[in-house]
Amino acid sequence: MTSPRDLPQDLHAFTDPTSVAVVGASDNPAKWGYWLATGALEGAGRRTVHLVNRSAATVLGTSCAPDLASLPEAPELVALCVPAAQVGCVVEDGMALGVRGFLGITAGIPDESGLAARIRGAGARLLGGNSLGLYDADSHLRLAWGHFSPGPLAIVTQSGQLGSELVIRCARGGIGISRFVSIGNQSDIGATELLADLATHRSTRLVALYLESFSDGEALFGALRRLRAAGKPTLLLTIGGSRASARVARSHTGSLTSTTDVVEAACRAAGVLRVRTPSELVDVARGYLAVGTRSGRRVAIVGDSGGQCGVAADVASAGGLSVPDLGAAAIARLGSRLPAGAARDNPVDLAGRGEADLTTYATVLDDVLADPGIDTAVLTGYFGRYGTDNPALTSHELGVADRIAATARSRDKTVVVHTMAPDGAVAEALWRQGVPATGRIEDAVRMVSGLAALSCELPGTTDLPLPADEPPIRPGYWAARELLRSVGVAMPPARLARTPDQVREAASRLTPPFVLKAGWIEHKSEADAVLLGLRDEEALLAAFASMRARLGEGDYVVERQDTRPGCVEMLVGARRDRALGPVVVVGLGGTETEVWQDTAIECAPVPSGTAEAMVARLRCAPLLAGWRGRPPVDTVHLARLVVALSQLIAARPDLAEIELNPVRVGPHGALPVDALVIPTHDSQLRRDSRLHPDSQDSRFSQDSYAPDSEDVTA
């Protein structure tokens, strides 16, 4: 695949070619050659179309050439609809003529990677093989199986069949396609180039992306971030989530971060919304194209059934939305409209008033949307079905729908309707005026959640100047300590010892109790390579003799033990994902960290605000805030550790993983008491130059991350 670092590439041959040849054109609707030939001929008013068939004089009433060499001109783009064994010969003929692009429909092309290399060497490009084709509404180009209607959604898909499903679902939902590209095997042109090209595509407002792999994920998500900055957000559908790679992970950090976790973090950093199913993708796409970016997570629920209101509130809360109490002014307004005893504090139950007067639906929605603490309203219940069950009410109900849409526009807020008649005239009228209407409350809530995510501001980035002098990354605990101390992370006072005399020297310089560690062993607890609570020199020497007898010679580390009360053991780690780049992790630590699986992960580096939010979203956050009379611990210092490690992993391509576990977080500081550093041997890794705006120093923040307690100062 061509390196995305060479972007932008000229993809004109695949977006608006001046001439097209379909090799393998056919009259048979069961063959690819038929669909690509009919599609190509639809654009004959814009470009020259050549059909090639070695055994037919005409196809679809159009004259055919027996081969490319017989054409009167060299086509800019050639679509390959021939058996795999014939592809190489057709491509060689095309390259000899000066063809600029090849669309590989055929699967199983012999030596496809070698063929792609020869195509690139000739100055041409290959899309595919195993592609379902492409379509561009702006340039009237269709070289794909299926039917397309023009519209604002671009689809880039690694699976042609799933891409076809999306096209069909979109058509049912009234969404047209601006561009469709089935990337197939990505032997040359990959998703990153195609996504980058969409930034300037006139008709595209929203992008749907299906990918199964992220081989150059940093470049890919960079392109997605630029799309979002251009006002064209992306909905990502992917599969996976396997933890197979965790079986070979050396650190807890590696075993706690799956590919799915990292993809989720990359999506947040790039402003991409990950969806789980094709139907969810189409639902959110319909909502976005109807509403745009005026949604938020603070939701008011309005309904004419207490049961439906309650279900909606539960589904919204489970979906990460907030259902806050309404303000006093809103409650007072509702009190003047609703029957006594009706729920007015969110959810709002109309308690029969809507049935008595349909305009109540619009009036109450206006009341709740006027509340500055509300971003979005969800209307659930019977509205939309009155006219279906009683046609005499149709006109009146449609008028109320108009008022609801006008309220959403005037308040510049989103209204989503859950209706029991999703295919009725009222639902259609609501959609037409920018108010989504769905038949299931979970779909309505999922849409609100997706729209809120797409309405968030894109996280900012800036450059990270790298330090001029970088000490090499070396394995072992002592080297890890020195690396961390060099970037401002405090560690317990310690001495390196290989002999009994050096152990005695350490005991004389440090304050007991002592900790003894075999510094070259990564997971010390499993190997009995760490001993705690050594009260004096005699106990320390005895422990050293016993440990050395079991484990052999090596770099042993004597540390002063952190004995502060009220500490919670946490983990802070960072690693370099092979495809998606550096990430940072924080979570509940200790030897049982994999059991609890309580972590937060983001792409590195992160600003302090993001680090603090990572800590706050942990399941153990209540434990950190103080539990059953215990004082709260210092999460600010914990977040500083997260920032420091995120900057370190981003700046050092020779660093594969770094982990602090446990980090003892007390009321007055966070102190790492063990660390693991794993170097990478890939000298070709690019330095990551991203840094968030609130970073203070040109290298790393040199604030001490040590607790304020005198007990842990050197």
Enumerate the predicted regions with their spans.
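Ser/Thr/Pro-rich low-complexity tandem-repeat tracts
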Residues: 683-689, 695-709
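Catalytic-core regions of core metabolic enzymes
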Residues: 1-683, 705, 710-714
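Short intrinsically disordered coil segments
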Residues: 573, 691-692
